């Protein structure tokens, strides 16, 4: 397609303006670390992450335009490019890496070292950028008219609107201030309780909520529809399944509970939360796995056509013009970088991956980077089935590793390491595509943005290990505070293939529940995540969704935009307490 040849970006190719400056790099690195930490906590707690591009863009505009009195839209764009890389890297890392901490808690292995986490994050992030760069001309330029890249286009619109003034940043900073005050009142002064609950003793059920602005922000962002499906999943778990378990089997015990620990004893000692953590989580994990597989199956025609079309588009090669807006990283740099990352993955002892695993990473990594880069252009990053890609990778790689003779905990750690790298590759490739679309619309230099992506990956990659260790030290993974739903699911998949020692009855209950939801045309993943997570989290998310519904009914479009910005600020600062 050649419609793009007539496209004129906001900043013409012949005009040179500030992009990569000390200010943009420092601000971008700070935001990459902050948003990466915030999204890591958010994803581990409620099983979903939010885009950082727009809040990063608004904050950068506020600082650069209002405080520093500079007028440089491309400088602000580079800030959001670097900053959003941290959010995407965290989203990929938290889906898999906490499984290693869960095994350490069970005494199967030592906790992963900071070096291991950092190298996996860096290698996955850098490969995600490098795999995507050769696709830019095919996807962003040649198919400009057909691949819309919703988040990338929206971010460009926000930056263009900011050219009229930087006042919008005040809403983000006011949201941050409100969140900081609230956290101080709840956790510092303890004037307001952090959670409230009500137990129905005769029914053996329980309902409650946690009083945190971050959860309200999530509910507001996802909206009432998704929030309600999550809440219904929790209601089914806590008001139907838990009471049924207590009613029909009080004097029995089921795996994985310790032999002799009856259901009645579990409930007497720990209440409904003990039944949830021992049994319902496995049902939820089965539902999440099924939801991911269903999502992947439904996306297969699109995935196949996406990969085929991307390969066809690349046959013509990259644009070799000298125009500033046509400049990419040189192919020899890309190839050397890919080879270097693969050698590090294979050769460094801290990463538990052998040459076969490194080969799997190259094959699956490039495939899913291509798929992710194109799919986010068609359906947006929010609908990109990264977890489904991770499940498919783990299923195949675990079977290959087991077939090669590497079994036990060593084989399981290798499978998780491979899955972690692939998950990060897919997430970063999708983010890079969105950012390059923003730059294409604004007239940014692609090469500069690609370097910015690498800077963001390195900054957040160096920080993510510390974030995971802090969360583990504060609460530990797998409990009510930090359930880590996707990581628990990946752990379950690997264990099931390697050892076959899972409570399959509970898992298949979740499978059939998910299939039932699909038959009823109810979105499976929100319901499954709600079933897996504690009801305390989803009740607060539901309230946020209701607030969004009420606000949407009363406010016009401009005010909705302002409300979204307040929510973003509230969400991100409320998570900084980690």
What are these regions (language model features)?
Residues 88-89, 140, 147-180, 319-323, ...:
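Helix-loop-helix junctions within the multi-pass membrane cores of secondary transporters/permeases
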Residues 2-112, 132, 136, 140-207, ...:
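N-terminal alpha-helical transmembrane segments of multi-pass membrane transport
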Residues 2-8, 130-158, 189-197, 215, ...:
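Juxtamembrane interface elements at the cytosolic ends of transmembrane helices
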Residues 8, 100-116, 144, 153, ...:
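Inter-helical loop and helix-membrane interface segments of multi-pass membrane transporters/permeases
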Residues 28-39, 57-64, 95-98, 121-133, ...:
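Hydrophobic core segments of alpha-helical transmembrane domains in multi-pass membrane transport
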Residues 68-144, 219-254, 272-291, 412-415, ...:
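Membrane-interface helix-loop-helix modules in multi-pass membrane proteins
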Residues 343-434, 441, 470, 481:
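Membrane-embedded translocation segments of transport machinery
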């Amino acid at each position: 397609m050649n419609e793009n040849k007539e496209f004129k970006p906001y900043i013409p190719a012949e005009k040179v303006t500030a992009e990569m400056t000390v200010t943009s790099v420092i601000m971008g690195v700070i935001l990459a670390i902050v948003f990466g930490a915030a999204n890591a906590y958010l994803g581990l707690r409620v099983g979903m992450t939010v885009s950082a591009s727009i809040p990063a863009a608004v904050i950068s505009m506020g600082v650069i335009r209002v405080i520093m009195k500079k007028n440089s839209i491309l400088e602000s764009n580079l800030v959001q490019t670097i900053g959003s890389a941290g959010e995407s890297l965290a989203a990929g890392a938290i889906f898999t890496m906490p499984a290693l901490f869960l095994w350490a808690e069970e005494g199967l292995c030592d906790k992963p070292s900071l070096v291991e986490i950092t190298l996996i994050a860096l290698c996955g992030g850098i490969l995600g950028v490098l795999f995507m760069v050769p696709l830019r001309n095919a996807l962003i330029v040649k198919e400009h008219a057909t691949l819309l890249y919703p988040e990338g286009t929206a971010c460009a619109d926000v930056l263009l609107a900011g050219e009229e003034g930087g006042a919008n940043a005040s809403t983000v900073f006011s949201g941050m201030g409100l969140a900081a005050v609230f956290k101080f009142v709840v956790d510092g002064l303890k004037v307001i309780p952090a959670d409230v609950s009500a137990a129905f003793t005769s029914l053996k059920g329980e309902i409650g909520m946690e009083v945190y602005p971050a959860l309200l922000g999530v509910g507001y962002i996802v909206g009432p529809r998704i929030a309600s499906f999550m809440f219904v999943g929790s209601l089914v778990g806590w008001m139907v399944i838990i009471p049924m378990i207590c009613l029909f089997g009080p004097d029995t015990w089921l795996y994985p509970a310790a032999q002799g620990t009856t259901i009645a004893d579990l409930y007497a000692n720990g209440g409904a939360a003990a039944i949830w953590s021992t049994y319902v989580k496995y049902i939820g994990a089965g539902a999440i796995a099924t939801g991911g597989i269903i999502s992947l199956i439904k996306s297969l025609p699109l995935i196949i056509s996406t990969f085929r079309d991307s390969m066809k588009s690349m046959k013509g090669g990259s644009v070799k013009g000298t125009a500033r807006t046509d400049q990419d990283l040189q192919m020899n740099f890309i190839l050397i970088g890919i080879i270097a990352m693969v050698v590090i993955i294979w050769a460094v002892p801290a990463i538990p991956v052998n040459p076969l695993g490194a080969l799997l990473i190259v094959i699956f990594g490039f495939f899913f980077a291509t798929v992710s880069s194109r799919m986010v252009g068609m359906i947006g990053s929010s609908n990109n089935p990264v977890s489904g890609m991770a499940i498919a990778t783990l299923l195949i790689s675990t079977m290959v590793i087991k077939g090669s003779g590497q079994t036990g905990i060593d084989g399981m750690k290798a499978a998780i390491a491979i899955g972690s790298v692939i998950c990060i590759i897919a997430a970063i490739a999708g983010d890079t595509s969105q950012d390059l679309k923003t730059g294409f619309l604004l007239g940014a230099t692609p090469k500069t943005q690609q370097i910015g992506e690498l800077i963001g990956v390195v900054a957040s990659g160096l920080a993510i290990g510390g974030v995971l260790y802090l969360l583990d030290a504060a609460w530990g993974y797998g409990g009510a505070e930090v359930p880590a739903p996707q990581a628990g699911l990946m752990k379950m998949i690997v264990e099931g293939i390697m050892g076959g020692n899972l409570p399959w009855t509970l898992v298949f209950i979740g499978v059939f529940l998910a299939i039932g939801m699909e038959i009823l045309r109810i979105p499976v993943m929100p319901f499954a995540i709600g079933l897996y997570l504690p009801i305390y989290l989803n009740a607060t998310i539901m309230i946020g969704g209701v607030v969004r519904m009420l606000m949407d009914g009363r406010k016009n479009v401009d005010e909705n935009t302002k409300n979204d910005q307040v929510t973003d600020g509230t969400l991100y600062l409320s998570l900084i307490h980690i």
